């Protein structure tokens, strides 16, 4: 159990350092990077067949962070800010460990931001759209009443249902 958690932590640190552009010293730079990243993800054209690998790696990093947080919460109840501070780290923290902790904290903030969660939902909808498209069309066909179906087809002339009675019908 501990070996698996250590492997996850090492992988997360490697992924965090591979995306070094996400790390910054000041809060303003972090917010600017976050908004730039999220606007680029939201405005870029997304292929229905596949998602670019950097977006999926960011989603994987966020799921890995959430897995680490859920494992820490199983041992005891902590708040989000306390998860990093209450973990057992070496007594003598060097610069590398501090940078790793800062990187993990910044990635947590990006993953928990509302804009990223909104983008994640949009991404799931786009990936599932191909599978659900046929099902939705079938449901719509069953739910539309007869009159609404007739109004969809403008090419067909509409026949009167009630004929006026005239003197020549006797």
UniProtKB/Swiss-Prot annotation:
One of its GO terms (biological process) is neuropeptide signaling pathway. It is found in: Secreted; Cytoplasmic vesicle, Secretory vesicle. InterPro entries: NeurotensiN. The keyword Electron transport does not apply. GO terms for molecular function: neuropeptide hormone activity; neuropeptide receptor binding. Its main location: secreted. It comes from the Eukaryota. The record marks 160-162 as: Cleavage. Residues 1-23 form the signal peptide. One of its GO terms (cellular component) is transport vesicle. Pfam families: Pro-NT_NN (PF07421). Brain and gut. Keywords: Cleavage on pair of basic residues, Cytoplasmic vesicle, Secreted, Signal, Vasoactive. Neurotensin may play an endocrine or paracrine role in the regulation of fat metabolism. It causes contraction of smooth muscle. Belongs to the neurotensin family. Interacts with NTSR1. Interacts with SORT1. Interacts with SORL1. This is Neurotensin/neuromedin N.
